[in-house]
Amino acid sequence: MNNSPLLVVGLGNPGPKYVGTRHNIGFEVAEELVSRSFGSFSVHKRSNTDIAQLPGLIVAKPRSFMNLSGTPIRALCDFFKISPANVIVVHDELELDFGSVKLRQGGGDHGHNGLKSTSKSLGTKDYWKLSMGIGRPPGRMDPASFVLKPFGKQELADIPIMAADAADLVEKHLQQG
């Protein structure tokens, strides 16, 4: 990592309709990181995001829909002069069991449109991805429908634990530089 801050972007969809859905788990992690530092989000108009500036860290929640996440992420990188190597994108991941949390650098998008948009806008796949396992949809349910559904009651109880685990990984990554 260079001297620029680490940019952590929690992916999700804007608006009350999507609160508590699987696709918005990235927002949960962003909020956990900010609450740990007693910070708060404010609107960053240039990038159309809500951001919190913390020591060595900028946490963001795009105000765009998931499939267009790359544009605000690129705007933040340009504004704060952050290279893709200093970006962590937090996203829902169908290919991981529910409750699993995994940090990886580079690699594919696993069909995730928010990651596709980010890779296209940044011009590289070489940024960090913090994958939040939401599991596969039941039966023959369409994955696109599954990610837009709210978590079940039992799952909902585990979201704070997952968000805390993910925030721990970000803090460890920040400390290791």
UniProtKB/Swiss-Prot annotation:
Site (Discriminates between blocked and unblocked aminoacyl-tRNA) location in chain: 13
UniProtKB keywords: Cytoplasm, Hydrolase, RNA-binding, tRNA-binding
Keyword Lyase: no
Active-site residues annotated for this sequence: 23 (proton acceptor)
GO CC annotations on file: cytoplasm
Localization of this protein: Cytoplasm
Catalytic activity, as annotated: an N-acyl-L-alpha-aminoacyl-tRNA + H2O = an N-acyl-L-amino acid + a tRNA + H(+)
Subunit structure: Monomer.
Protein name as catalogued: Peptidyl-tRNA hydrolase 1
Organism of derivation: Corynebacterium glutamicum (strain ATCC 13032 / DSM 20300 / JCM 1318 / BCRC 11384 / CCUG 27702 / LMG 3730 / NBRC 12168 / NCIMB 10025 / NRRL B-2784 / 534)
